[in-house]
């Protein structure tokens, strides 16, 4: 079974542009990471505050490549995966769908799993209203599963040419991969 664990960093909150896409591909035989930075025409100040990527920095990191330059590779990887997994996956799928639509293409995938929603009844973090449970932030999920930042950094260095901190798509994609792996080992997830 081919599974992709992924995350995006974006130019803002409404589907604008993806400035970084990272994913871990697990196909039963091997695990590999892919990280892509993209040149973008703008980054909202609020987004830059979160991930630290300016238009100039992205131009350098991407080597001038735009999302459309890697569209075929991304389309193949995601459309051939049996499952794609992300934390608040609906957000990331929305941006991927938008990027594909800019090129008059359709973003295709078979099935998705949102780790944020799937782990809500497992983590059981109380809401401030004391009714039901709140969605765990990725950091809260890692803490619940006893996955530490150095675990994520070590795995990033094994899968990618570099490593970033929280709100770098490499970090978040690897964190989701490790969370699902650990949850399966603990029998919390099938």
Protein language model regions, located:
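A structure-centric signal for secondary-structure junctions around beta-strands
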Residues: 18-20, 109, 170
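Acidic, Mg2+-coordinating catalytic module of metal-dependent nucleases/exonucleases
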Residues: 80-90, 95, 131-190
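P-loop/Walker A phosphate-binding loop and immediately adjacent motor/lid segment at beta-alpha junctions
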Residues: 103-111
């Amino acid at each position: 079974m081919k599974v992709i664990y992924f995350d995006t960093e974006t130019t803002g909150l409404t589907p604008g542009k993806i400035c970084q896409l990272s994913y871990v591909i697990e196909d039963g035989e091997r695990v590999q990471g892919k990280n892509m930075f993209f040149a973008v025409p703008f980054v909202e100040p609020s987004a830059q505050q979160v991930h630290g990527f300016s238009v100039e920095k992205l131009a350098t990191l991407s080597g001038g490549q735009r999302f459309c330059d890697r569209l075929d590779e991304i389309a193949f990887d995601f459309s051939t995966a049996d499952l794609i997994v992300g934390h608040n996956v609906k957000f990331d799928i929305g941006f991927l769908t938008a990027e594909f639509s800019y090129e008059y293409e359709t973003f295709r995938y078979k099935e998705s799993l949102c780790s944020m929603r799937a782990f809500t009844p497992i983590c059981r973090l109380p809401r401030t209203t004391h009714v039901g449970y709140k969605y765990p932030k990725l950091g809260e999920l890692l803490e619940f599963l006893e996955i530490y930042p150095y675990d994520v950094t070590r795995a990033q260095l094994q899968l990618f040419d570099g490593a970033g901190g929280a709100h770098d798509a490499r970090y978040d994609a690897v964190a989701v991969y490790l969370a699902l792996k650990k949850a399966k080992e603990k029998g919390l997830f099938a």
